[in-house]
Amino acid sequence: MMVRRVNIQYSLIDGMMLSGYAPEVGDMFGQRRTGTLAPGLGFAFGAVRRSFIDEADERGWLVKNENMTTPAMINSAKNLTIRANLEPIAGLKIDLNANRVDTRSTDIYYMQDGMPEQMGGSFTMTTIALGSAFGGSGNANNGYSSKAFDKFIAHRSVIAQRLMDTYSGTVYPSSGFMAGHALAGKPYDPAVGGGVSLNSMEVLVPAFLAAYTGKDPNKVGLSAFPSVKSLLPNWRVTYDGLIRIPVIRKYFKSMMLSHQYRCSYSVGAFSSFLDWVDAGQDGLGYIRDIQTGNPTPSSPYDIAAVSITEGFSPLFGVDATLLN
């Protein structure tokens, strides 16, 4: 197989909007000397992170009163694109394309005690779901059931058990809404504090991915935001070698066969739970059960919906020009 070309592009865009910044902006790189440079050369050259807001607060640079309600905002967009052009034999060309886009926005309410944060964003990446592409979607007689959907339902118990095993041996946190709670600092007990629900998003999303992409539910990642290692390419295949056959060349000026497959996994607009408390390892954590007030295992994010969009354009195409 001959690799003709490989192109890798990665972009990272970070931004910060800090409302309520008190010092005046200076003339040189936007700096004003107030005992130290404000807001600092790091801010001027875009080399600031979340800690800058804490430093600005400690130095009294932020306006904090009942009229200030606009949070500081930190935006981040990561975009990875990988393209490759292959030509295994003369006339057969394969174009591979893989893409992963992760966009996040964090609102930091620095004017409130504890500086609560809320994160939102979106996520999309290319993947392959051929295993369920031709399985059908059922009909009214069988309740529109399908093999992929039946697998999705069955995979929930496997994913839930994996999550339960992950929480097993941990202790409940003592911060956030868990401060002063009777379970704070005690070993995790699903019978007391609530276990992993089969219908929670942290169960449904991995079960959905395993069912529709053909992955083993015992091995599929548990995150709703798969890492770069899970990135799979889409492709376009063309072949124009048939025109070299004499009988075809006799009647056609050109002939090209084509096939294209596109598939992407997307997480729609999501936000973080304001009351989520980190359990201290591997992204484990809890949210407060509205009815009981007890901790319920949960990911940090409130995800409304995920989707897999798949298509062939075309599944098989012929583009020919006659000799006339």
Question: Locations of the language-model features?
Answer:
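Exposed, low-structure sequence patches enriched in small/polar residues
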Residues: 1-324
